[in-house]
Amino acid sequence: MSSAAAIIACALSLLGRSERTMPPITLVEAPPKHASIQADAFVSLPDPHIYVITSSPTFRDAMASRSSCSESATMKKLASVLAHEEWHIRNGADESGAYYAQLTTLLRLGVPPDNNVYRSVQRSMQAVLKKRKQKPDLVLAGR
């Protein structure tokens, strides 16, 4: 198993999940042109795959801090990103629902609302929802 695959396995473990119980996860180096450059992962519906961006700060931080499968804030954020993208695959394009699933996952993993990781996801949600009101996107991405 590659180091990148081990990071995904660790994030899934935090969720109490395995590769068998999640939509397929594909690692990509960079987001496509139609996705946000700040995205950690994305889906392109109706394709049922979660694409995790290995050049994202969240993934790079998880790789750098990995001595063993940890419950670091970065790993919890990555796990919540997977929950966000899975929500899209199961429920569709609604960003509000996906972000609420992500925030709920962070809470379940022990990340409190006053934590920087939780707040950064809230800020991303607000920015994405504001942008969507102005112009709908075709690609869904979690940060």
Segments from the language model and where they lie:
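Post-HExxH zinc-binding segment in Zn-dependent metallohydrolases
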Residues: A93-Q134
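Stable alpha-helical elements in mature extracytoplasmic
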Residues: A4-I7, T74, L78, L82, ...
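Active-site scaffold of zinc-dependent metalloenzymes
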Residues: A35-A79, I89
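Intrinsically disordered, low-complexity segments enriched in small/polar and acidic residues
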Residues: R119, V139-A141
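N-terminal low-complexity, Pro/Thr/Ser-rich intrinsically disordered segments
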Residues: M1-A4, R132-K133, L140
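A metal-dependent hydrolase signature that marks the N-terminal structural subdomain at the beginning
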Residues: M1-P48, S67-S68
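Short active-site segment of divalent metal-dependent hydrolases/proteases
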Residues: A83-N91
